[in-house]
Each structure stands twice: as structure tokens, then as C-alpha cells.
């Protein structure tokens, strides 16, 4: 049986413990040995990043330098176009072949808006969705047809993620950290401490670069 590979996308502006710690727990829960972080260059669903792509790449490299679970994929940073998950997963599937189990990790907030994503219906053709639960978010989609879509693909058996190459949605019980990039940027702008929110090398780099001031 080929091992499950997971992709974790985001803006990472900046990367922080709220990104890393839930995924580390997730890896232990479901048996992931490698998580590929894929920062996006031009996110289509949110405001554009304050740090440029080179700076965000460096912050990620610093954050995962001593974490063998994580590796970095720069393909979306090299595109001068919107970063569409559907497109990236098609490429990833072509590279890995038809039989390797692949998964894309998202937060529960992203699941609720998932049907607005570009070609969202193709994503489960190429990967599973692993959803990190977040308190305060509903478990139901806004419209009945999307709720049916969720129920059609939902599994409560994590073994399905390893045995099938794609097509399942799994809700993972991961810890939630009340940390966001917005909170960090606001604290930095106000001259407040962020030592408890992100890795020390990342904070040092932010200060050296004068970011988020």
C-alpha cells in the first residue's frame, strides 16, 4: 500500500503556530509521514498578502527547518496568476500517478465556502479533503445540494484515506489555537509581543525585514 501524501495550502502571511501545530497533531492521528506546504502567490479568495512571495517563502523555510514532517513546494509562488487549488491538485495527481492516496488539508471555515472555489467539483477527483475542525463553525453547508455533496463523500474511517486514492472528506479532531495572521499583524503594528504565536526564527526575520509595521 502506498503511503498517504498530504498537501497544505495557504497564504502564510506570516506562518504561525495555528498553522503548524494542528497539522502536526493531524499527522500523528492519521499516520502522515510527510506534509507538503504550498504557499500561494495570488490567493483568489482573500486580500493579497502584505509580505511578498520571497519573504513568505523564507518565513516558511525558517519555520520548518527542524521539522522533518514538512516540505515546501514553490509551484504556486512561481505562477504570476491566481493560485487555484484545483489546478495544483491536477498537476500533483499527474506527477504522483493514479494510485497514490493524496489529501488536501483545509480548515472547517474553508469547507463551508468550498463550493465557491474554482472547479471545486474536480478537487475530490484528485485528492481527499481532510478538514481540521474549528469550534464555533457549523457542520452543515449553507445549501441543501452542497450538504448532500458533503454527505456523499464524508467518511468517519481514516483508513479510507489510506486505501483509496481520492474522493473522501474526513473531519479530523485537531486542537484549535486562537491565532491568526491578522492578530499577529495587528500586534506587530501595535508593538506588542508575538513570541507565543509563531516560531522565534520567523519573528526574528519579520523584525529584520521590518514587516507588518
Swiss-Prot record:
Keyword Phosphoprotein: no
Reactions listed under catalytic activity: nicotinate beta-D-ribonucleotide + ATP + H(+) = deamido-NAD(+) + diphosphate
Pathway: Cofactor biosynthesis; NAD(+) biosynthesis; deamido-NAD(+) from nicotinate D-ribonucleotide: step 1/1
Primary enzyme class: transferase
EC number: 2.7.7.18
Keyword NAD among record annotations: yes
GO terms of biological process kind: NAD biosynthetic process
Family of the protein in this entry: Belongs to the NadD family.
Protein name (Swiss-Prot/TrEMBL): Probable nicotinate-nucleotide adenylyltransferase
Species annotation: Shigella boydii serotype 4 (strain Sb227)
Lineage: Bacteria, Pseudomonadati, Pseudomonadota, Gammaproteobacteria, Enterobacterales
Gene name per UniProt: nadD
Amino acid at each position: 500500500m502506498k503511503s498517504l501524501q498530504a498537501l497544505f495550502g495557504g497564504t502564510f502571511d506570516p506562518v504561525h503556530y495555528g498553522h503548524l501545530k494542528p497539522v502536526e497533531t493531524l499527522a500523528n492521528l492519521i499516520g502522515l509521514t510527510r506534509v507538503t506546504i504550498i504557499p500561494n502567490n495570488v490567493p483568489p479568495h482573500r486580500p493579497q498578502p502584505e509580505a511578498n512571495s520571497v519573504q513568505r517563502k523564507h518565513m516558511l523555510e525558517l519555520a520548518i527547518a527542524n521539522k522533518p514532517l514538512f516540505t515546501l513546494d514553490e509551484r504556486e509562488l512561481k505562477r504570476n496568476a491566481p493560485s487555484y487549488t484545483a489546478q495544483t491538485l491536477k498537476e500533483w495527481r499527474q506527477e504522483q500517478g493514479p494510485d497514490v492516496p493524496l489529501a488536501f488539508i483545509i480548515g472547517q471555515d474553508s469547507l463551508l465556502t468550498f463550493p465557491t472555489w474554482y472547479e471545486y467539483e474536480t478537487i475530490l477527483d484528485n485528492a481527499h479533503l481532510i478538514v481540521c475542525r474549528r469550534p464555533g463553525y457549523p457542520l452543515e453547508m449553507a445549501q441543501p445540494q452542497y450538504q448532500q455533496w458533503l454527505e456523499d463523500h464524508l467518511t468517519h474511517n481514516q483508513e479510507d484515506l489510506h486505501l483509496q486514492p481520492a474522493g473522501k472528506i474526513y473531519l479530523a479532531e485537531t486542537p484549535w489555537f486562537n491565532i491568526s495572521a491578522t492578530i499577529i499583524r495587528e500586534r506587530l503594528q501595535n508593538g506588542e509581543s508575538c513570541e507565543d504565536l509563531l516560531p522565534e526564527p520567523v519573528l526574528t526575520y519579520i523584525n529584520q525585514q521590518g514587516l507588518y509595521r
